[in-house]
Amino acid sequence: MPREIITLQVGQCGNQIGMEFWKQLCLEHGISKDGILEDFATQGGDRKDVFFYQADDQHYIPRALLIDLEPRVINGIQNGEYRNLYNHENIFLSDHGGGAGNNWASGYHQGKGVEEEIMDMIDREADGSDSLEGFVLCHSIAGGTGSGMGSYLLETLNDRYSKKLVQTYSVFPNQMETSDVVVQPYNSLLTLKRLTLNADCVVVLDNTALNRIAVERLHLTNPTFAQTNSLVSTVMSASTTTLRYPGYMNNDLVGLLASLIPTPRCHFLMTGYTPLTVERQANVIRKTTVLDVMRRLLQTKNIMVSSYARNKEASQAKYISILNIIQGEVDPTQVHESLQRIRERKLVNFIDWGPASIQVALSKKSPYVQTSHRVSGLMLASHTSIRHLFSRCLSQYDKLRKKQAFLDNYRKFPMFADNDLSEFDESRDIIESLVDEYKACESPDYIKWGMEDPGQLMTGEGNASGVADPKLAF
């Protein structure tokens, strides 16, 4: 029985990475740009209905909502070659089309204004599912629509569909370059609060690291957004292969996440992928074995979060959990041997209070997509060094807040009216508490953490540490 997943693409970035994701899924399942099954797509064994449903004329339609407050990207999709793929009733554009002006408060406020309209769309999609498992939100945390409206949707989904899983693919801004969004630290902090309290799993897509990988690994001198987005769609499609080509394990989202997220607050995942190739790029042909792929996944240069192992404290940083999704022609005995070799060489430093094991899910490769390598792998990992990414967000926020810079843009909206900036302070406290929790994970006493000092427990709807999230219980 399919466990359907509804995808919400919010804002410019969310719609761009969402579009790439659907292109990739169409290729892998043999679905044409118009949603019609290709003549050659005769092999069964895949579950298209997790992400698609069939219209009366048998063509496949993504279970997706395209939401934006300014029309440019969605108009591009509606006039592009995949225009007939989507259900046009599931496209929401703001009436005035002015966008959110890179202001979280504007996106959040406008989200509140159109809540009924968007929730109607979501309810309609949910009613059309036999056994809805959850939602996937694609967005960025730095702008206005993806961050503000995305935050509002996360809160609303939590209220309306409290038993359903919510996973996000969240794009973090490039912190090596000066941003064209000066209020990025404010937007990021306010969104991070919602990602901490209202999401069950956040896959962190860090633009800093994606750019670095594009330059170092793909030898692109000046990577375009389209090229980094294709890296993102590779990760998104690989992370859903076990749902779309089901085996006996990890064939639904709960199963996939339950092992990765032992405590509810530490639900931010980093990813690694190998071997990487981008179209039009000279492919390096090499022998890909399971051991080679699994070893490469642990190398810092393949990991798509920049904070990882690039600072003096990295030696204390530890893995909380690892799931490797290996695609291709794989013999399970090779997996066992590879895990043994990795253990013998002590290539991985795990936390002391949990099972020190790399989990492996084997998955079929799409028969319709030709690749030059036999085996490819995606790593989804929870690692304590992710806290440095949050610490950097905090320090950038503190710099701006100290100068009281650009706060007038926020005071125009009801949440910050009458100079009430408590939302910022509360968000900061929650992210600081999250950083502390990841640091505490590195010590063997973590299980007792937060028990003695009630002040360390989270405000709002968040779970206290050590309390299992009922949605992730089997």
Swiss-Prot record:
PROSITE patterns xref list: TUBULIN
**UniProt-listed SUPFAM superfamilies:** Tubulin C-terminal domain-like, Tubulin nucleotide-binding domain-like
What drives induction of this protein's expression?
A: Up-regulated in galls upon nematode infection.
Give the subcellular location.
Cytoplasm, Cytoskeleton, Microtubule organizing center; Cytoplasm; Nucleus; Cytoplasm, Cell cortex
One GO process term, biological-process aspect:
microtubule polymerization
Keywords from UniProt, A to Z, are:
Cytoplasm, Cytoskeleton, GTP-binding, Microtubule, Nucleotide-binding, Nucleus
What Gene3D superfamilies does this protein's entry cite? Answer: Helix hairpin bin, Tubulin/FtsZ, C-terminal domain, Tubulin/FtsZ, GTPase domain
User: Which Pfam families does its entry note?
Assistant: Tubulin, Tubulin_C
* A single Gene Ontology CC term: cytoplasm
Tell me the residue numbers annotated for binding GTP. Answer: A142, G143, G144, T145, G146, S147, G148
Matching entries from InterPro entries are given as: Gamma_tubulin, Tub_FtsZ_C, Tubulin, Tubulin/FtsZ-like_C, Tubulin/FtsZ_2-layer-sand-dom, Tubulin/FtsZ_GTPase_sf, Tubulin_C, Tubulin_CS
Judging by the UniProt lineage, the source's domain of life is Eukaryota
Q: Name one GO molecular function term.
A: GTP binding
Main location per UniProt? cytoplasm
What the record says about family reads: Belongs to the tubulin family.
What is the stated purpose of this protein? Tubulin is the major constituent of microtubules. The gamma chain is found at microtubule organizing centers (MTOC) such as the spindle poles, suggesting that it is involved in the minus-end nucleation of microtubule assembly.
Q: How does it assemble?
A: Gamma-tubulin complex is composed of gamma-tubulin and GCP proteins.
Identify this protein by name: Tubulin gamma-2 chain
Please name the source species.
Arabidopsis thaliana (Mouse-ear cress)
Record gene name? TUBG2
